[in-house]
Every structure is written in structure tokens, then in C-alpha cells.
Curated annotation (Swiss-Prot):
Subunit structure: Interacts (when activated) with GGA1, GGA2 and GGA3; the interaction is required for proper subcellular location of GGA1, GGA2 and GGA3. Interacts with PIP5K1C. Interacts with USP6 (via Rab-GAP TBC domain). Interacts with RAB11FIP3 and RAB11FIP4. Interacts with HERC1. Interacts with ARHGAP21. Interacts with ASAP3; the interaction is stabilized by calcium ions. Interacts with NCS1/FREQ at the plasma membrane. Interacts with TBC1D24. Interacts with ECPAS. Interacts with MICALL1. Interacts with SPAG9 homodimers, forming heterotetramers. Interacts with CYTH3. Interacts with ASAP2.
Reaction(s) the record says it catalyses: GTP + H2O = GDP + phosphate + H(+)
Name the record gives this protein: ADP-ribosylation factor 6
Lineage, uppermost ranks: Eukaryota, Metazoa, Chordata, Craniata, Vertebrata
Positions of GTP binding: 23-28, 41-44, 63-67, 122-125, 155-156
Gene name of this polypeptide: ARF6
EC number: 3.6.5.2
Family: Belongs to the small GTPase superfamily. Arf family.
Pfam families named in the record: Arf
Organism: Homo sapiens (Human)
A Gene Ontology term for the protein's cellular component: Flemming body
Keywords on record: Cell cycle, Cell division, Cell membrane, Cell projection, Cytoplasm, Differentiation, Endosome, Golgi apparatus, GTP-binding, Hydrolase, Lipoprotein, Membrane, Myristate, Neurogenesis, Nucleotide-binding, Protein transport, Transport
Amino acid sequence: MGKVLSKIFGNKEMRILMLGLDAAGKTTILYKLKLGQSVTTIPTVGFNVETVTYKNVKFNVWDVGGQDKIRPLWRHYYTGTQGLIFVVDCADRDRIDEARQELHRIINDREMRDAIILIFANKQDLPDAMKPHEIQEKLGLTRIRDRNWYVQPSCATSGDGLYEGLTWLTSNYKS
């Protein structure tokens, strides 16, 4: 019955896994979306999970810590994921190759084959931040032909680009 009502009234739920290297801005994004304000964060050991409702869609967002020692645990969160939000610190040119390797490791896992991919090109407010087209190239996204992906420029602290990213997820998710 719930599925019938959600079809009629347009309420959808989406399981989102938010990953990225440490200090990319994942937790800041999660709580900016949830609370509408910037919060002081500490490095996430483990995960945060929150439900964010936007445009009649309930996003169940799992924000998992990004330190290199925690990354092997990411795969334990893959099952049932419908959308991947991969957050990149656009000012961190030294680690963009590391980000690319991690992204491709995630999306090549069979548990993630059906997930659509949103890249938040975060920290666009910082000087010398890489622009979306540069992120697209450096992450090797143009070679991904069999998946639905999108790069959204963002600034977690101001909220710029965050809701546009959620809009893309709602428009491209097929339940």
C-alpha cells in the first residue's frame, strides 16, 4: 500500500552513500542540507546518517569517514545504495589522483553497479579551486560510458550547489 501511495503522491526514498577523501567536506555537506547551517566538524570515524527531505524525496544519506585507514570499510555500506555522492576538495590538487583511484574502486564494485554518481566539486570558494571540467577530466569521468554521472560545483559552507545536486539525483533516479 505504501508503494501505491508513494506512486500517487510522488514520495520517493533514496539511499545515498556519501564518500570522498578525508577533509573533502562530506560531513559539512550533510549537516548543511539537514540543518541549513554550517557546523563545526571533526574527522568522521565511522559514519553519520541523516534523512534529508527535498522535493518530496527522502534522501537517507550515509556519510562515511574518508581517512585512508577507514576506506577499506566503505564496501560494507555499498549494498542497496541507489546514489553515490563523491565529494572532492577542488583545492587539493595534490590528492586528486588519489580521489580518482578511490572513485573508480567504488564504482567498479558490483554492489555499486546500479548507483548513479553525483560528484560534488566542493570548495569552489577557495582560490585556485579546480573547475568542474577539470575535475571531470582528472577523475577520468569521460571514460565512464555505462553509468549516469554528473559533476556539480559546490561550496558546503555557503550551501552553493548542494540543492542543485539533489535535484540532479531526483531527476536521474529510476525507482
